[in-house]
A protein has these predicted regions:
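Membrane-embedded beta-barrel scaffold of Gram-negative outer-membrane proteins
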Residues: 366-370, 589-656, 795
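Surface-exposed extracellular loop regions of Gram-negative outer-membrane beta-barrel proteins
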Residues: 319-321, 551-595, 616-641, 736-750, ...
Length: 841
């Protein structure tokens, strides 16, 4: 079997936990200041996901390794967090009662590292919430991010998301301060494997939808900043489901001098893809393994090593497809019979070494060296013979609608031999210095990029017996016809090798002070600068943010942030449709001038804490590169430039809709458009910049304004909701709902200004029903029962796409006998079930 090594790891990891036989029990009762018991308090080992919750009587039982100094954290929404240090003897039972105090800060999600108030909105997500989240996508963390305000996604099979009118390439992702990159050739959600982020290894998740400070890098839209755990106890987990398996282990070694964190995952979506419209032989196999090891040389100096390896393979041999589309007035059925197959492979790796040195409590210095590489291939030869017919909805034949009119037949062939290799080296230095009420941060990075891209792809369409597009036959001399080469569609052919050296850095200061009336102010100002080696351009990005909390209304915070954000092209933005790279003089660094005004209101309803957050924003975009999206594949008009804007309103309310458990709902209203320069020739035809670069003549130029960008989703609404049976918290329900209005699209080979059609709205509900079979408080009569080594065990039944909505990922364009094009929807996954078993040791 191809993944024997992964199965071996999955079976081996639980044995690490079984070896920990020396244990003790910490137990007690948790009450408030008035002596009332508090249920559902999280009692956990610091910086881990291992813990228990108090029951309806406020009691808790936490099993801990013996002879180990451990920090235990007691936390609950609306109460101050309590930390204790404990060292238990073998088989010791120690009672520790806890009295919790009500805190003025209602929700712990709204915390910040350097100040109690943030100058720009940062949303913190509890990583433990991703464990029971129903998900078919590539990552639980990204699926949680999709429910936040300002974020939109219309493909559950992908971990990609849009933020405030931006595209997938405009989002920064960091893991332990290291920038994460994505595969280049992935073109559909079915091909996308596992995201880099392993939710089982995560400690903190911070997300900003815009207006972020200068310490974060050069992207236009968002930042997802993830910190992996630094374990203090030994623990493991194993998850099995119909979609794959994952396992992890964590702990300490060498008397606490070393911390280790290892995770492995395997995913197979054959079960999901087999129920889609296109039938055939699907063999998607995605696997990865990653580890984080920290060695503490002293209390002030540590070395951290992060390693990641991923191997993804997607084989599809389609046989048939049947899709109904249209409306009540005109309904059609498309049938396709296929030959051929597609095979895509993606192998990626990342290694990083980080040196963290703190000469004193106020100064921290970090040095990071990282290397990323990816070897990707996309090969396919697929022939489809299609048939279009009109469906008669009024009359049934054998209980089914039947086709009464043959509308067209045709054949198409898709061919690709694409190979891509990338390598990115980074050398970083970051520092932070605290003095008085100030925090000074700085950083500098050198980056070396290498890309080797071989592309060879084309399409051919033959409708009604002739090839499209075709050369007009010669009627002057039919006995000696013109010998002309076959013309193909969407031809891209080339071999590009590219070396780029980049340099960037930042300087930022934050300070907090009070005014005469006791109001608290936090001001952050910084400056970023980068040198882009492709064309030698230098860009400067000033950014600032200010927050104010009135003394008379400490439950309110007002924020204003913004600045200049630039994004040098990585590689995708440099490649034109024909496979060539744009010339250096025409390459542009995209820029965005942003301003964000926000308000945060903390209140209580039903005697429970809530937070209402709202932000309005405006972005002026300049030197942006127009693009189009097919499924999740982005293709840039690399030799064109545009200006544009995006503006909108984001709102989110989160709190205890159900006592003791946090849920939230978010809504976003947004509009984003762009203005593109076109040219008019002598016959009045509209030409693009690409046509002019290819030698076309024109009479005058014109600016077409108000073109909806491909990410122009006007309304987006999302809910993340948790519930449990009263007094029986072992029965839980997790629900995720996403609604988004349709995105713009247009026919193939059309210009951007022509792509104004709208997809149908994206509507999806995923729900999971979970039962905790074993908890830390569960005891068994036989002390030798192997189940005693299980700390938590959950069994979940997940229902994907509960409403059974046919959501659209993209369109297949076919032509009938009248030369009319039809946009046939490519539907995403339908309603399906998944069974998941989660075991924590």
């Amino acid at each position: 079997m191809k993944y024997k090594w992964l199965i071996f790891i999955l079976l081996l990891l639980p044995s690490f936990a079984f070896a920990q036989k020396s244990e003790g029990v910490l137990y007690g009762k948790i009450t408030d200041n008035d002596g009332k018991v508090i249920e559902l308090v999280n009692v956990a080992v610091q910086n881990t996901s291992f813990g228990v919750v108090s029951d309806a009587r406020g009691n808790y039982n936490l099993t801990l390794p013996a002879d180990t100094l451990i920090n235990v954290v007691f936390s609950f929404v609306g109460y101050e967090e309590i930390k204790i240090e404990v060292r238990l003897q073998n088989e010791e039972r120690r009672r520790h009662d806890v009295k919790m105090k009500v805190t003025s800060t209602l929700l712990p999600e709204m915390t910040v590292h350097d100040q109690s108030i943030k100058s720009s909105a940062i949303t913190r997500i509890d990583a433990r919430e991703t464990v029971l989240l129903p998900s078919v996508g590539a990552g639980g963390v990204e699926d949680m991010v999709k429910t936040l305000a300002g974020v939109s996604s219309t493909n559950e099979l992908s971990s990609q998301y849009n933020v405030r009118g931006g595209n997938f390439d405009e989002n920064l992702i960091y893991v332990n301060g290291i920038e994460i990159y994505k595969p280049f050739l992935v073109g559909s959600g079915q091909q996308e494997g596992l995201s880099f982020v392993n939710s089982r290894l995560v400690s903190n998740i911070d997300f900003s939808a815009g207006g972020f400070s200068a310490e974060y890098g050069d992207k236009l839209s968002s930042v997802l900043d993830i910190t992996y755990k630094k374990p203090t106890i030994t623990a493991s987990s194993l998850t099995l489901s119909l979609l794959g398996a994952e396992a992890h282990t964590e702990g300490m070694a060498f008397k606490g001098s070393m911390n280790y964190l290892i995770g492995a995952r395997y995913k197979n979506t054959q079960y999901l893809l087999g129920a889609m419209d296109t039938k055939g032989d699907y063999k998607p196999n995605f696997a990865d393994v990653q580890g984080l090891i920290t060695y503490n040389i002293s209390s002030r100096f540590e070395i951290t090593a992060l390693g990641y390896y991923s191997r993804n393979s997607y084989l599809m041999a389609p046989t048939t497809r049947e899709t109904d589309f249209g409306n009540l007035q005109a309904s059609y059925r498309l049938k396709v019979y296929f030959d051929g197959q597609e095979l895509s492979k993606y192998t990626t790796g990342l290694g990083a070494i980080s040196l963290n040195f703190s000469p004193n409590e106020d100064l921290n210095l970090k040095f990071i060296g990282s290397a990323y590489s990816a070897v990707e291939s996309e090969t396919y030869d697929i022939q489809g013979q299609y048939w279009i017919g009109v469906i008669d909805l009024n009359n049934e034949y054998n209980g089914e609608d039947h086709v009464v009119t043959n509308q067209g037949v045709g054949t198409y062939i898709e061919h690709a031999r694409n190979y891509f290799y990338s390598r990115v080296y980074n050398l970083d230095h970051k520092g932070a210095y605290k003095y008085r009420d100030n925090v000074l941060k700085w950083g500098v990075r050198y980056q070396n990029q290498l890309f080797d891209d071989i592309i060879n792809e084309w399409d051919m369409v033959d409708s009604a017996g002739y090839t499209q597009p075709h050369i007009t036959d010669s009627i002057l001399n039919p006995n000696n016809p013109m010998q002309t080469p076959l013309e193909l569609k969407n031809v891209a052919n080339g071999h590009n090798e590219l070396y780029i050296n980049n340099l960037d850095g930042y300087l930022q200061n934050s300070w907090q002070f009070e005014n005469e009336k006791g109001g608290i102010w936090v001001l952050t100002a910084g400056l970023r600068a980068n040198y882009w080696g492709y064309n030698g351009s230098v860009n400067v990005s000033p950014r600032a943010g200010i927050a104010f909390q009135p003394a008379k209304r400490p439950n309110m915070t007002f924020r204003l942030s913004g600045g200049v954000y630039v994004q040098p092209p990585f590689y995708r933005e440099l490649r034109m449709f024909n496979g060539d790279l744009v010339s250096k003089d025409k390459a542009s660094v995209q820029k965005s001038y942003q301003v964000v005004l926000g308000h945060e209101y903390q209140f209580k309803a039903w005697d429970r804490p809530f937070v209402l957050t709202s932000e309005i924003y405006y972005k002026y975009l300049t030197d942006i590169i127009p693009y189009e999206v097919d499924n999740i594949r982005i293709r840039y008009y690399a030799d064109q430039k545009a200006t544009g804007h995006a503006y909108g309103l984001d709102m989110k309310i989160n709190g205890e809709f159900v006592k003791g458990i946090e849920s939230w709902a978010s809504m976003s209203i947004m509009k984003t458009t762009e203005n593109i320069q076109y040219f008019i020739d002598a016959q009045g035809h509209i030409l693009s910049q690409t046509d002019i670069n290819n030698g076309a003549d024109y009479v005058r130029d014109t600016i077409i304004t108000g073109i909806p960008r491909p990410s122009d989703q006007r309304i987006n609404f999302a809910i993340f909701f948790q519930d449990y049976i009263p007094y029986v918290p072992s029965f839980k329900v997790n629900l995720k709902l996403i609604f988004g209005t349709g995105l713009p699209f247009g026919p193939p080979e059309s210009q951007r200004y022509q792509q104004k059609n709208r997809m149908s709205a994206y509507r999806r509900v995923d729900i999971g029903f979970s039962k905790q079979l074993i908890s830390d408080a569960t005891t068994f009569r036989n002390p030798r029962n192997p189940l005693n080594y299980i700390r938590n065990c959950w069994l979940s039944l997940e229902v994907f796409n509960l409403l059974g909505v046919n959501n659209v990922s993209s369109y297949m364009w076919v032509t009938d006998i009248y030369n009319i094009q039809y946009a046939v929807p490519n539907y995403l996954t339908n309603r399906q079930l998944n069974l998941k078993l989660i075991v924590e040791f």
